[in-house]
Amino acid sequence: MRQGGLCHGLQLARADLTGLNLVNREGPRGFLLEQCNLYRANLRGAHLYGIRIKGGSLMKADVSDANLHCAELHDVNLLGIRWKNTRLDNLDTGRRLMQDRKGRSERDPVQARVWFKEAEETYRDLRKASEAQGIFTMSGRYIQQELTMRRLQMPFWSYHRFASWIVDLFCGYGEAPMRVVLFSLLLIFICSIFYFFCGLNFAGNHLIYRPEATLEENAIFLLECLYYSVVTFTTLGYGDFTPVGLSRIFAAFEAFTGSFTLALFVVVFVKKMTR
């Protein structure tokens, strides 16, 4: 390989490659292995810094105590790999694992669930291995994908799948606090629009959008609606503005949603920052 040998389609199933050194010290990128079969290969203590593997299989291979810093494992079967004490800093497994990609494109629901189950197991192993190395940013991404695979195995119209999707949408299974912030800002803005057209009460005066009013007057009222929406979302309730008519429904919904959204943000943020 170092002398330009063939690196495509190697059949190394069950091969004993203990301590193998494939570090490319003469180039900026690691060696490239394409469509290689390393099923149950023994790669204990191997030096694979920067290795690039595309396609093929590492299924049930033993990479215990190996060095996979900056390795690229794209579209590779990683099911059942032994990751004990494997160095995984900056490991790149692509946007999706091979089983994940195949499961999403599979039309047979039974076979798709098989792919998703294998993908879930692989993501779980990667998550545990990265946690063992203290790489919590990487483990956070893998736990999101693991739980996504678990959701995709559920019946399409089931309550549990819908609930799991909602949790993923709002906070990325506890790994994306910025999603909570964006949802909060979006809800505040949308509710302010409803208040703008449904009206508010201020000091005994009924305020509502009026087409005959000047642009400046309507713009000021829109800002007041935005202020009231923020106050309602955070459940401060100063009492200067009060909802009337349909605005009461939106205010009650916003206050209810805001109370647990703020609590959710605190939980997600603390979880993310204390790792």
Task: Indicate where each model-derived feature is located.
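Tandem repeat scaffolds
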Residues: 1-142
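Coil-to-alpha-helix initiation sites in intrinsically disordered, low-complexity, charged segments
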Residues: 96-98, 151-165, 217-224, 244
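Alpha-helical solenoid repeat scaffolds of the TPR/TPR-like class and their adjacent stem/linker regions
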Residues: 110, 122, 148-156
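Extended, hydrophilic extramembrane loops/domains of integral membrane proteins
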Residues: 136-154
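Short amphipathic alpha-helical coupling elements at transmembrane boundaries
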Residues: 141-144, 168, 251
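Transmembrane alpha-helical segments and their cytosolic interface motifs
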Residues: 155-199
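Outer-pore turret/helix-boundary of cation channels
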Residues: 186-225
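Pore domain of cation channels
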Residues: 212-275
